[in-house]
Every structure is written in structure tokens, then in C-alpha cells.
């Protein structure tokens, strides 16, 4: 893993590169880890798509959705069951793996099984969590809080780099806009790149989430995922984060904003075309 200190930093995980001036790479997978079989099936399908399209892929999923709307909502398989599955995906499929951490005490253990530690948006200012993630030496992907201006993320990134870890990604996932609503300000993408000096990821699926919008769960408008993803790629980003599932409507979490797996390849093809035009204008 490496990160340059030039105006166009690059974070590398194996053969996957994230750079604001490079062709986009993709972070994709289901919202939460549902079972070993489900994870391997989705990861295998995504790997095949990435190979056909010749695009960098990081597999993502969560062992614990710690901020569910309802106390009774499914949260995932938990740390003990999930880490061996993460390790198997890395070893058997050769895919880099991303998962989120919620407590500083989780970071060292989780880092043994994954390539990227993700800091959830609601926790992006938690200094102890950021420092613990940075101390692992792994790539740290920090989601911008829905309550922050893009330039506020400069302080967040500095907390990580102050621990001698330059391997940072920052992810835009929308800003709070009234009750149960997020809005994506595309100006945030170049501002994040300029003020943080990090590769910028656009989270196309959580940006269409309606937090708490269904009473005991969050709603979403997945029909707008392609629209926002195309807009972000046209502006210019290092990568796109897309949650996908074979049957989103039966998923235990974030179903309303996940992309059906059968639609994933077509979406990525279109995004690659927009990306090529944005970064190689004629």
C-alpha cells in the first residue's frame, strides 16, 4: 500500500489503485455480511464482472451495522464469525476487502483480515477511532459525516496522517437536507480533493438513502443511484462505492438503495465511459 504526496495522490491495494486522475476503481458488495455462502457468491460475481470490464474492485461488506434505526433490526454476523469469511474472500478470490469499524478496540483485530478499514460517517470525528485505524497501517476510508462541510474533512484526514499513515481515502455520501433526506452537492468532490489531498470516493447508494424514512428502518431511492453516480464521475473521482445485492428487496438492511446485482455490470460500463471522457477530454 502506498500513497504519494503529489497533487494527485494514489492509494494502492494490490493491483487496485485509487487516484483522482486515474481511471475509476469500484468498491462494491452487499450492505451487511449475511452468510458465508452469500458473501462468496456475490464476491465471485463481482470479481467476474470486474475482470470482464478490466476495472479495479474492492469487495465491501459489514460485520456489524451498529447504527441501525431500530434496536430489533438485523446487524450482521458479528466480528468472530465474519473475520474468517473476510480472510477467505481475500485468499480464495484474491479480492481486497473493506469493512467498517466502530470502536478503537476493533481495529487491530479486523486489520488482520481486511485491506481497508472504513470509518462510518457518524463516527468520522472520533479521534481515538481514527488513530487506532491509522495505527494498523491499513488503508483508512473515512466517510464524510452528513453534518460536515467538505473542507471540514481536512482535519479528519490530518488525524490519520499524524499517525504516520498516508493511506487515506475520503468518501462523499451526501449531506443532511431536512428530515429523512440527503442531498449530494457535487461541488464537494473537488473541494474534498483539494482540501484533504486524498483520493475521493463517491458513495452512490448511501447518497440516495432516506435515513429513518420508514419509521423503524431507512428508506431509499435506488432509481437515482445511476444519476448521481454519473454526475460524480463526470466531475471526477478516484472511485465509486456501490452497494449491490442479488435481491435488494429481501436484504436485511439498506435494500431500498442497493443496486440489483443483475444491473451492476451495465451501470459500471456506463460509468467507465463517463470517466474516460471526464479524464481524457478530446
Swiss-Prot record:
It is an enzyme of class 2 (transferase). Its EC number is 2.5.1.55. GO terms for biological process: keto-3-deoxy-D-manno-octulosonic acid biosynthetic process. It comes from the Bacteria. It comes from Bradyrhizobium diazoefficiens (strain JCM 10833 / BCRC 13528 / IAM 13628 / NBRC 14792 / USDA 110). HAMAP family: KDO8P_synth. Its main location: cytoplasm. InterPro entries: Aldolase_TIM, DAHP1/KDSA, KDO8P_synthase. Pathway: Carbohydrate biosynthesis; 3-deoxy-D-manno-octulosonate biosynthesis; 3-deoxy-D-manno-octulosonate from D-ribulose 5-phosphate: step 2/3; Bacterial outer membrane biogenesis; lipopolysaccharide biosynthesis. GO terms for molecular function: 3-deoxy-8-phosphooctulonate synthase activity. Keywords: Cytoplasm, Lipopolysaccharide biosynthesis, Transferase. The lineage of its organism: Bacteria, Pseudomonadati, Pseudomonadota, Alphaproteobacteria, Hyphomicrobiales. It catalyses: D-arabinose 5-phosphate + phosphoenolpyruvate + H2O = 3-deoxy-alpha-D-manno-2-octulosonate-8-phosphate + phosphate. This is 2-dehydro-3-deoxyphosphooctonate aldolase. GO terms for cellular component: cytosol. It is found in: Cytoplasm. Belongs to the KdsA family. Disulfide bonds: none annotated.
Amino acid at each position: 500500500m502506498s500513497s504519494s504526496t503529489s497533487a494527485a495522490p494514489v492509494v494502492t491495494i494490490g493491483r487496485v489503485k485509487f487516484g483522482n486522475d486515474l481511471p475509476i476503481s469500484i468498491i462494491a458488495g452487499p450492505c451487511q455480511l449475511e452468510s458465508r455462502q452469500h458473501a462468496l457468491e456475490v464476491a465471485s460475481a463481482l470479481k467476474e464482472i470486474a475482470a470482464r470490464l478490466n476495472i479495479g474492485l474492492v469487495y465491501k461488506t459489514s460485520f456489524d451495522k451498529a447504527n441501525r434505526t431500530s434496536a430489533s433490526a438485523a446487524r450482521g454476523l458479528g466480528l468472530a464469525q465474519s473475520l474468517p469469511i473476510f480472510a477467505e474472500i481475500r485468499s480464495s478470490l484474491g479480492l481486497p476487502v473493506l469493512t467498517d469499524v466502530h470502536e478503537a478496540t476493533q481495529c487491530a483485530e479486523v486489520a488482520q483480515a481486511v485491506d481497508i478499514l472504513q470509518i462510518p460517517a457518524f463516527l468520522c470525528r472520533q479521534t481515538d477511532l481514527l488513530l487506532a485505524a491509522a495505527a494498523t497501517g491499513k488503508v483508512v476510508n473515512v466517510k464524510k459525516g452528513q453534518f460536515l462541510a467538505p473542507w471540514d474533512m481536512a482535519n479528519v484526514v490530518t488525524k490519520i496522517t499524524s499517525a504516520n499513515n498516508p493511506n487515506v481515502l475520503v468518501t462523499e455520501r451526501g449531506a443532511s437536507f431536512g428530515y429523512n433526506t440527503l442531498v449530494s452537492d457535487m461541488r464537494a468532490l473537488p473541494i474534498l480533493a483539494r482540501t484533504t489531498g486524498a483520493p475521493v470516493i463517491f458513495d452512490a447508494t448511501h447518497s440516495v438513502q432516506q435515513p429513518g424514512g420508514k419509521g423503524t428502518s431507512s428508506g431509499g431511492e435506488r432509481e437515482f443511484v445511476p444519476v448521481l453516480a454519473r454526475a460524480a464521475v463526470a466531475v471526477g473521482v478516484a472511485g465509486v462505492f456501490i452497494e449491490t445485492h442479488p435481491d435488494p428487496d429481501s436484504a436485511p438492511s439498506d435494500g431500498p438503495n442497493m443496486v440489483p446485482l443483475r444491473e451492476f455490470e451495465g451501470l459500471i460500463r456506463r460509468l467507465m465511459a463517463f470517466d474516460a471522457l471526464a479524464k481524457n477530454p478530446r
